[in-house]
Amino acid sequence: IMPYYGVPVGQTDEDVAMGYNKIILTDLLRDELGFTGVVCTDWGIVSSRAWGVEGLTIRERYKKSIDAGVDQYGGESDPEHIIDMVNSGELTMERIDQSVRRILLNKFELGLFEQSLVDEQAVSELVKTQDYIDAGFEAQRKSIVLLSNKGAEAPILPISTGSKIFVDGLDPEQVSGFGEVVNSPDEADFIIFYLPTIFNGNQVPGSEELIDKFLSGILPDENLAFDPSILERAQNYSQKAKLITVVDLNRPAILTELNDMSDGLIGTFGVYDSILFEMIFGHFDPQGKLPFEIPSSMAAVMAQQEDMPDDSEAPVFEFGHGLTYRQ
């Protein structure tokens, strides 16, 4: 088990991160729940993300986390502190052996000492089988969420085969089997506009400020709204043809403006372009549902309770939303 980075605020006798919290790792996880396996920390909890124990030295952080119940460290590479504590008597070999037994047991059960190398020739037979490939494609089909499907007389989706299509952000070769790909939005009957997941620093290539936010944050917590330049491009597209906007939703995004501009709005979670086009052209009926709500604004995001999954004010799309072509 890998404990969470965060602090269980107000739930134990001290507000320290899970990896330093004896009540969580020993009293709850091992004694109450009966866990006997390895506790491996998330990456860098000693050197860079020591939430709740920032005032401790590196050596003290190692000692506290081991006393809490940690067996193995992710992303740390300085065992000298632990060796020194054993030599000085601060840590007993009995405690070290306790973790060693847990770690070695996993390796024994996997047979790593008897057969440490895999049979490379068998990989394609065991892993990349047609059944697994088909199951993966089917999972992608089931994951696509049709968020909105507008139209004056009839819903815009699915698109009729043979329509003139302009694509932005997707592989035009993949759509060529469904419709006529055109080189300009002015020539198109439909524009399919794909937007990747918002990770702040990826919106304006070359922007040092945004890239710093992305890279230094690692787990981004900045604005969920799209850059104004993207909204302007979508607005321009909407004035030239019917606009189908596709947004990858590895994390929620503010879709208020895009929903207003788009004739059709689709949420994806990392699918092949070909699978997406199958859905857009009606080869299968979408059935995906949102695993979270889509908030209406950043103000609504900031006002909601961080420990509640779907309590923002007036969300654009609620948790569990998802249309089908039959609706």
Where are these regions (language model features)?
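Hydrophobic faces of well-ordered beta-strands that scaffold small-molecule active sites
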Residues: 1-3, 37-41, 72-74, 243-245
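Flexible hinge/switch segments at interdomain interfaces of large molecular machines
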Residues: 113-121
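Hydrophobic, small-residue-rich alpha-helical packing segments that form membrane-like cores
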Residues: 3-21, 27-32
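Mid-to-C-terminal alpha-helical segments outside catalytic/metal-binding sites
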Residues: 93-112
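C-terminal non-catalytic regions of proteins with extracellular/luminal or membrane-system context
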Residues: 12-19, 34, 43, 48-55, ...
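Catalytic PLP-binding core of fold-type I/II PLP enzymes
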Residues: 26-44
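Conserved phosphate-binding loops in nucleotide/dinucleotide-binding enzymes
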Residues: 50-67
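Conserved, mostly hydrophobic/aromatic
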Residues: 1, 42, 69, 103, ...
